């Protein structure tokens, strides 16, 4: 598939991640950016409103965009609420969505799974597109077979809307698949300030840090008598996510089901 041209539409092209996705499309020979979806600048060229070379038109109407451009793949890098709507519409139009937003419920995923089966096309929803972050999650799941005590600290820029991050939640979920259930810490521990011990998922504590100067970082800390193990990943710029976006676009053309999490398409 990598030698065949893949027609792309990008939703949210002017956002920080969206700008990187436009650059990715421009420098990848077998990607053809045929349109973009935004809440403004309808029927203007991307090159007229952004420092890019693409002459693809911007659409404020997603249905019109899909009808006129006939894309193979939608790359959605918007918000959780908008991303949910775009994903469903894309599948209804026979367009394969690659989604980089979080916030999908079990009911949402079930509905989208039914749509992919009905249409016979693939969809990929990835809380994190950084390949290093995916490996961090895989390594953490491996370590959880031997270390029962674990806490997750995720650190992001101060404009991130959700906490804990989708990556932290996914990491906890993967660890829980192999970790023996255990209540960590002293059974009588008391929080002097509410929330001091962080959020909890399946007995795993999750801590969120939000500061300017950060991009996306996560540390998974394991401990047992006499030793600790720390697995950490850092994204220093948003270009770090593009290798995963590229892989997802290529892989979504080869599957006919919904995949949640990039770890499921990496051996």
From Swiss-Prot:
It catalyses: (S)-2,3,4,5-tetrahydrodipicolinate + NAD(+) + H2O = (2S,4S)-4-hydroxy-2,3,4,5-tetrahydrodipicolinate + NADH + H(+); (S)-2,3,4,5-tetrahydrodipicolinate + NADP(+) + H2O = (2S,4S)-4-hydroxy-2,3,4,5-tetrahydrodipicolinate + NADPH + H(+). Its main location: cytoplasm. (S)-2,3,4,5-tetrahydrodipicolinate binds at residues 157, 166-167. The active site is at 156 (proton donor/acceptor), 160 (proton donor). It is found in: Cytoplasm. The keyword 4Fe-4S does not apply. Keywords: Amino-acid biosynthesis, Cytoplasm, Diaminopimelate biosynthesis, Lysine biosynthesis, NAD, NADP, Oxidoreductase. It holds the Pfam family DapB_C. NAD(+) binds at residues 12-17, 100-102, 126-129. This is 4-hydroxy-tetrahydrodipicolinate reductase. It comes from Bacillus subtilis (strain 168).
């Amino acid at each position: 598939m990598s030698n065949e041209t893949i027609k792309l539409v990008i939703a949210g092209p002017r956002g920080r991640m969206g700008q990187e996705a436009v650059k990715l499309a421009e420098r990848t020979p077998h990607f053809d950016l045929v349109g973009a979806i935004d809440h403004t600048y309808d029927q203007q060229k991307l090159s007229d409103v952004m420092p890019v070379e693409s002459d693809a038109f911007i659409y404020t109407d997603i249905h019109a965009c899909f009808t006129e451009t006939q894309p193979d793949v939608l790359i959605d890098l918007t918000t959780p609420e908008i991303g949910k709507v775009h994903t469903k519409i894309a599948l209804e139009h026979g367009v394969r969505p690659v989604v980089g937003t979080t916030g999908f419920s079990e009911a949402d995923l079930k509905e989208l799974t039914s749509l992919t089966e009905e249409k016979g096309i693939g969809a990929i929803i990835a809380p994190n597109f950084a390949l290093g972050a995916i490996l961090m999650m895989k390594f953490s799941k491996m370590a959880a077979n031997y270390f029962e005590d674990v806490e997750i600290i995720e650190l992001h820029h101060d404009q991130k809307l959700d906490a804990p991050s989708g990556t932290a939640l996914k990491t906890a979920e993967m660890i829980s698949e192999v970790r023996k259930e255990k209540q960590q810490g002293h059974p009588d521990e008391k929080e002097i300030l509410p929330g001091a011990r962080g959020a909890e998922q399946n007995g795993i504590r999750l801590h969120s840090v939000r500061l300017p100067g950060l991009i996306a970082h996560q540390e998974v800390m394991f401990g047992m008598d006499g030793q600790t193990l720390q697995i950490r990943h850092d994204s220093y710029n948003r270009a770090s996510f593009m290798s995963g976006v590229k892989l997802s676009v290529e892989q979504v053309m080869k599957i006919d089901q919904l995949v949640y999490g990039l770890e499921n398409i990496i051996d």
